[in-house]
A protein has these predicted regions:
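Carbohydrate transferase catalytic cores enriched for Leloir-type hexosyltransferases
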Residues: 1-175
């Protein structure tokens, strides 16, 4: 699962390429959901490039692109996801990372600084823009249930640090 706009900085093509390797080399029946707007802040060229890649590589039956989703739909996708992947090469904060940890699903994200700060040791990192490394991390999560359990456990605790109460406490300490 990935939830976010179709923008170049989100690097969704790396995710789609990694997913292709995953489908080509495993017998998994998992599908990839790329949910998010292609219009609001979205880059239509990025969207078209991803759609072309999906079509050219016969991935249409395996990749779902529902477009913009509302809160109820987002909850559904998070509650039914096997993992959340955040391949961004640049990100301001990354709220879906926290949402995924709260939804008790393991997270795989690029090794950019903001994700290291938010995710710390509760997510799996891959080298940004490296679809082979992302593919290897996808395989790892599928093979090792103890890693999934560890990530979920740590993720729940980590996400709790980013609740409103803790934010207000931190803000009050500044002033």
């Amino acid at each position: 699962l990935h939830v976010g706009t179709f923008e170049k900085r989100k690097d969704l093509l790396t995710l789609v390429k990694a997913f292709k390797l995953f489908k080509d080399n495993t017998k998994s029946n998992l599908k990839l959901v790329l949910a998010g707007s292609k219009n609001f802040n979205g880059d239509k060229q990025v969207y078209r490039e991803i759609k072309r890649y999906i079509s050219k590589n016969n991935l249409i039956p395996f990749i779902i692109i529902p477009g913009y989703i509302n809160k109820k739909q987002a909850i559904y996708y998070f509650n039914n996801a096997f993992t959340y992947v955040f391949p961004s090469i640049d990100e301001g904060f990354g709220i879906p990372l926290i949402e995924a940890m709260r939804a008790r699903i393991p997270v795989i994200c690029s090794d950019i600084e903001i994700f290291k700060e938010i995710g710390y040791n509760s997510v799996i990192y891959f080298k940004k823009q490296d679809y082979n490394d992302l593919y290897n991390q996808l395989k790892l999560i599928c093979k090792d249930k103890t890693i999934v359990e560890r990530l979920v456990s740590k993720g729940i605790k980590r996400a709790d640090l980013f609740n409103q109460k803790n934010f207000i406490k931190g803000f009050e300490k500044l002033y």
